[in-house]
Amino acid sequence: GSGLVGSEMCIRDRSDTVGFIRKLPTELVESFKSTLDEVREADLLVHVVDISHPTFEEQIEVVNRTLSEIDKTEKPMIMVFNKIDAFTFVPKDEDDLTPRTRENIDLDELKRTWMNKMQDNCIFISAKERTNIDALKALLYERVKQIHITRFPYNDFLFQQYDEE
């Protein structure tokens, strides 16, 4: 498969945020703080969301609120909606006048909403089915490249310019 040039240097590691969706036991708080330190040091945050989870939007809010509490700087973020293969919705009958709920929103409508909200800094994938994995790699590559070029404008070691012709 194709890899990211220089990805070993740029994407140091990922932090698992599932632990703070619900209240943390006291003994985990200290180890969790070190995970949060990694967030403070990161140049780019990649938030992976399980889109098949019934309360995924609530989980996104908890993560975003926690991120803003621990780090006041605005960091670039890519939202990765995973498990599109397991996403389900309940279509409503045309004559059904009850208000729509989250269960009535299809994947295309969800994509449009989140692409708008995230200014296209999100992607919908299925890691299991390998759907959009190459697009995810390309998106990560572009974002890391933008950060690198901003930080090191005269150093194209990681991202050398090639003619596309």
Residue ranges and their predicted role:
Residues 12, 43-44, 75-78:
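Loop/turn-to-beta-strand initiation segments
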Residues 54-165:
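C-terminal-of-GTPase-core extension/linker across diverse P-loop GTPases
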Residues 1-11:
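Single conserved hydrophobic/aromatic residue that forms the stacking wall/gate
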Residues 12-31:
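Switch II (G3) loop of P-loop NTPases
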Residues 29-53, 66-69:
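Inter-motif core of Ras-like GTPase G domains
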Residues 14, 48, 80:
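Generic enzyme active-site microenvironment
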Residues 3, 28, 56:
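Short, conserved glycine- and acidic-residue-centered signature motifs
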